[in-house]
Amino acid sequence: MAKVPSVTLSSCGDDIQTMPVIGMGTSSYPRADPETAKAAILEAIRAGYRHFDTAAAYGSEKDLGEAIAEALRLQLIKSRDELFITTKLWASFAEKDLVLPSIKASLSNLQVEYIDMYIIHWPFKLGKEVRTMPVERDLVQPLDIKSVWEAMEECKKLGLARGIGVSNFTSSMLEELLSFAEIPPAVNQLEMNPAWQLKKLRDFCKAKGIHVTAYSPLGAARTKWGDDRVLGSDIIEEIAQAKGKSTAQISLRWVYEQGVSIVTKSYNKERMRQNLDIFDFCLTEEELEKMSHLPQRKGVTFASILGPHDIVLEVDEEL
């Protein structure tokens, strides 16, 4: 079983919290059937994954909860405390009075008493009637960061979440949040990979003590919205051949060497294990230099999901 390092999160109030640097993502489109998802999560636990990333919007919280219960029954883990669980507040419920009911619904789905990291999923508020995307402009509203964050802090104070964070937040949004936060965000989860390196935003987060977690670290390859700009890179392929590793392993190692944790998703048993096997080598200065010059392009924009509305384009411009 692979041994995965952990990172200490510095923005968790008075608590010291550690998080495994590689987490298994559980989003899939179209959504995987529950039995397939549960089997994959159990296999991931056997392989050594201890961090699992889900969200209310993914529809995978119940699958993860049932898999955790089964892992306990099978004694793959001795206690729920061995796992680090991240889930997210969906944008349709991103208002002060809905945060507490939302985390309680997630806790029920997951069959756990606390969440390790509760994250604001999107930097917008969506109307509750949203069922399909793109959406009309009036259904995309500015996020009331102050009131929502106060409710997130309450989740932590009540012990329902051990850490709280954000996702897809720009530096200006983080500046606003930090100006009033009693408990600063522990993480900012962002799309990041060798083909979208986000150095300026990462440097900002580091200076503020906010840890960055990368989603789509392989460019969302093999999905309808991703492409092969990472796994198909000639430069990454050249480095992979020289090291006897896969292009995915080189890409994940690069993300890790930036001081960033990773959420990667595969339900393939072999790839699942390969994605953990990145801690027995390092990239050379020459290799890092080559990768720093890869062509840069963001994989998914909010405008491509929600529509080219002014509020959406403004966030895309900063990310």
From Swiss-Prot:
Substrate binds at H121. It is an enzyme of class 1 (oxidoreductase). Gene3D superfamilies: NADP-dependent oxidoreductase domain. Transmembrane segments: none annotated. Its EC number is 1.1.1.365. Pathway: Cofactor biosynthesis; L-ascorbate biosynthesis. InterPro entries: AKR (IPR020471), AKR4A/B (IPR044497), Aldo/ket_reductase_CS (IPR018170), NADP_OxRdtase_dom (IPR023210), NADP_OxRdtase_dom_sf (IPR036812). The keyword NADP applies. The active site is at Y58 (proton donor). Involved in ascorbic acid (vitamin C) biosynthesis. Belongs to the aldo/keto reductase family. This is D-galacturonate reductase. The lineage of its organism: Eukaryota, Viridiplantae, Streptophyta, Embryophyta, Tracheophyta.
